[in-house]
Amino acid sequence: MPGWSCLVTGAGGFVGQRIIRMLVQEKELQEVRALDKVFRPETKEEFSKLQTKAKVTMLEGDILDAQYLRRACQGISVVIHTASVMDFSRVLPRQTILDVNLKGTQNLLEAGIHASVPAFIYCSTVDVAGPNSYKKTILNGREEEHHESTWSNPYPYSKKMAEKAVLAANGSILKNGGTLHTCALRPMYIYGERGQFLSRIIIMALKNKGVLNVTGKFSIVNPVYVGNVAWAHILAARGLRDPKKSQNIQGQFYYISDDTPHQSYDDLNCTLSKEWGLRLDSSWSLPLPLLYWLAFLLETVSFLLRPFYNYRPPFNCHLVTLSNSKFTFSYKKAQRDLGYEPLVSWEEAKQKTSEWIGTLVEQHRETLDTKSQ
C-alpha cells in the first residue's frame, strides 16, 4: 500500500492519545494530523518527542467549524474520529452534547467527502446498544442481535445517531469520484492509565479515607483496556485501506472488548486499586429496584422544578441502569474481519493501571502533606 496520512480527532483525549502513539509506528505512514479543541502542554510535549519518521502535526480547532475541518482533511487518507463529549450526569446542556457528538460528526463526514478522504472510522460506544433495563441480561452479545439503546439521554442518543450517520455514509461518492468506506467501533467501558472516570473514582476514595464508593455492585460487564481499544482502531485503518479486507469491513460496526474478566464495576475498581490500600464500602446500600425508583423520583422533581430552578439529581435512571446491568459483548466479529486480538493481556493491563493509580495515591499524599505544614 502506498504512503498514506491520517487525521485523528479527539487526539488529546484518553483513547486519541493512545491511537496517535500506535499510529506513528505504522509502515508507509507519511503524516499524522492530531486534532483537538485544545491540547494540554504535557500532551504537546509528549507528541513532539514521538520517535517516528512520519510528520506529526497538531491542530487546535473546533469540530463545529466546518471550514476548519475541510482544511484539516485535505490530502488525508483515513479519518479516525474519537472526539466527543461524554456526560452521564446531565451536567452539560443537551444541545451542547448533540452539537459536538452528532453535528460535529456530520461536519467531519461532509469535510471528508469534500476532501475526497476514502476511509472513515468512528469511535462509537457500547452505550448505543443499551442497556435499556437492569432487569434484562445480555451476556456475550453479538452484532447480528441488533441491540439498540432506547434512552433519550443526550450522550447515548447523540452517539447512536452519529454512528448511524457514519454507517449510512458508507458508499458515498467523493468529490474526486472515489467511494467513501466507513466503519464504527463500539468499545466496552474503557479503563487504563489516565482514564477520567477511574481517576475521579480513585480521588474520591482517597478523600474518603481510602473507601471506594459502591455504585455498580449488581453489574456484570467486560471492561476493555485503553491500549486494546487503540489497537482495534489501527487494525480498522489497515483493513479499510486493504481492498481485500475492506469489502467485509465497510458499513459494519464492531464490539471491542478483550480478555479482562467479566465482573462488576465495583470489583474492577477494587482489583485495580487494592494494592494501594483502597477498599470497597461495606456499609448497607439500597436494593436496586428501590434505587431505580428513587432516581425516577429525583428526575421527576428536577423536571417539575425546571421552570424555576435548575436542580440536577446526584444520579438518574439511565446511570443506575448503566451501572447495574448484566451487559457483556463478544469481540469475535472484530477478530474475524479486522484480525483483532488483544495486544495487552489482562495481567499486563491490570499492572499498568495499578501502577498509575499508585501515582495518584502519591500525589494525594503530597497534597495532604503540603496542607498540613
Swiss-Prot record:
Annotated NAD(+) binding lies at: 159
Keyword Membrane: yes or no? yes
* Main subcellular localisation: endoplasmic reticulum
| Gene Ontology CC terms, in alphabetical order | cytoplasm; endoplasmic reticulum membrane; intracellular membrane-bounded organelle; mitochondrial membrane
Q: Which GO terms describe its molecular function?
A: 3-beta-hydroxy-Delta5-steroid dehydrogenase (NAD+) activity; oxidoreductase activity, acting on the CH-OH group of donors, NAD or NADP as acceptor; steroid Delta-isomerase activity
Topology in the lipid bilayer: Single-pass membrane protein
Q: Which reaction does it catalyse?
A: a 3beta-hydroxy-Delta(5)-steroid + NAD(+) = a 3-oxo-Delta(5)-steroid + NADH + H(+); a 3-oxo-Delta(5)-steroid = a 3-oxo-Delta(4)-steroid
Q: Which residues form the active site?
A: 155
One family from Pfam that matches here is 3Beta_HSD
| Disulfide bridges in this chain | none
Subcellular localization: Endoplasmic reticulum membrane; Mitochondrion membrane
Q: Which processes are annotated in GO (biological process)?
A: C21-steroid hormone metabolic process; steroid biosynthetic process
UniProt KW keywords:
Endoplasmic reticulum, Isomerase, Membrane, Mitochondrion, Multifunctional enzyme, NAD, Oxidoreductase, Steroidogenesis, Transmembrane, Transmembrane helix
Question: What are the TM regions of this chain, as residue ranges?
Answer: 288-308
Pathway involvement of the protein, from the record: Lipid metabolism; steroid biosynthesis
Q: What Enzyme Commission number does this protein have?
A: 1.1.1.145, 5.3.3.1
Where does tissue-level expression of this protein occur?
Answer: Adrenal glands, testes and ovaries.
Q: What does this protein do?
A: 3-beta-HSD is a bifunctional enzyme, that catalyzes the oxidative conversion of Delta(5)-ene-3-beta-hydroxy steroid, and the oxidative conversion of ketosteroids. The 3-beta-HSD enzymatic system plays a crucial role in the biosynthesis of all classes of hormonal steroids.
Annotated PANTHER family: BIFUNCTIONAL POLYMYXIN RESISTANCE PROTEIN ARNA (PTHR43245), SHORT CHAIN DEHYDROGENASE_REDUCTASE FAMILY 42E, MEMBER 2 (PTHR43245:SF51)
Name recorded for this polypeptide = 3 beta-hydroxysteroid dehydrogenase/Delta 5-->4-isomerase type 2
The source organism is Rattus norvegicus (Rat)
What is the phylogenetic placement of the source species in the record? Answer: Eukaryota, Metazoa, Chordata, Craniata, Vertebrata
